[in-house]
UniProtKB/Swiss-Prot annotation:
Disulfide bonds: none
Protein name: Chlorobenzene dihydrodiol dehydrogenase
Pathway annotation: Aromatic compound metabolism
Matches recorded under InterPro entries: BphB-like_SDR, BphB_TodD, NAD(P)-bd_dom_sf, Sc_DH/Rdtase_CS, SDR_fam
Active site residues of this protein: 155 (proton acceptor)
MF annotations from Gene Ontology: oxidoreductase activity, acting on the CH-CH group of donors, NAD or NADP as acceptor; oxidoreductase activity, acting on the CH-OH group of donors, NAD or NADP as acceptor
Family: Belongs to the short-chain dehydrogenases/reductases (SDR) family.
Presence of the UniProt keyword 4Fe-4S in the record: no
Amino acid sequence: MKLKGEVALVTGGGAGLGRAIVDRYVAEGARVAVLDKSAAGLEEIRKRHGDAVVGIEGDVRSLDSHREAVARCVETFGKLDCLIGNAGVWDYQTQLADIPDNGISEAFDEMFAIIVKGYILAAKAALPALYKSKGSAIFTVSNAGFYPGGGGVLYTAGKHAVIGLVKQLAHEWGPRIRVNGIAPGGILGSDIRGLKTLGLQDQTIATMPLADMLGPVLPTGRVATAEEYAGAYVFFATRADTVPLTGSVLNIDGGMGVRGLFEASLGAQLDKHFA
C-alpha cells in the first residue's frame, strides 16, 4: 500500500476522474475527504468505502466550502497530507466566434471560477494543514494546458492558467510543501459537464465517441480510462519517491505531443522484425 497512513482531500471526487482517484487512494491505504456538489455521488462513495472516507457537500467556488472540507478532514482523520484540486467543467470546444456577445463575460466567469479560482480557494483553505503535515498539492490540468483543441478558448486559457498556478505555488510554498500538476488527455467514460452559461450543462463527454476520435491519432493507440489515470495521482502523493518533485506538470495524454506528421506512431513496423 503506497499511501498507507496518508490523508487526502479530493475536490470533485464524486464522479469521473475524481471518483477514480478516491477509489485508488483508498485501495492504497489512504483515508480520503471528498468535496463535491453531488449528495448522491458522496453517498455512493460512503457506501463503497465506509469509514475510510468522509464526504462534504459544497461548492468549489466558495472559500467557506473549502474551509469546511479541510476542517472536516482534519476533524475526522487528524491531518491532511495531500490536496487534490480536481473539480472541473468543460466548454465542449466552443470557439470564441460562437460565444454570443451578451454571454461571454458570464461564460468566462463560470469557467474560471471553477477551474482556476476553485483551485486557488482550495489551496488557501488547505495551506495551514499542509504546512503542518509538510504535505503536497496536486492539481488536475489537461492536455489543453499544453495544446490547442483540447477545449475551446475558455477551457484552454483556464488550463494554461492552472500550470501557472502550479509553478507559482511551488515557488511560494517550497520547501515546506510540494505542488505539482497532472495533465490527462481524453478520459474514456468521463462525465464532466459543460458550462451552464453556454447551455451545455446537460452534455457529458461520455456521449462522445472518444475511442474512435482519439485512439487512431495517439501513439498509444487508445484512450485511457479514469482508473488508468489514477495511478499518476498515487505516485505524486507518495513521499519517499517524490522528494525532488515540485513545480512539475506530468503530461499523461497518450503521447499527443509526439505524434508524427503522417502517422500517430511507427511501433507497428517493429512487428516485421520481432513478431
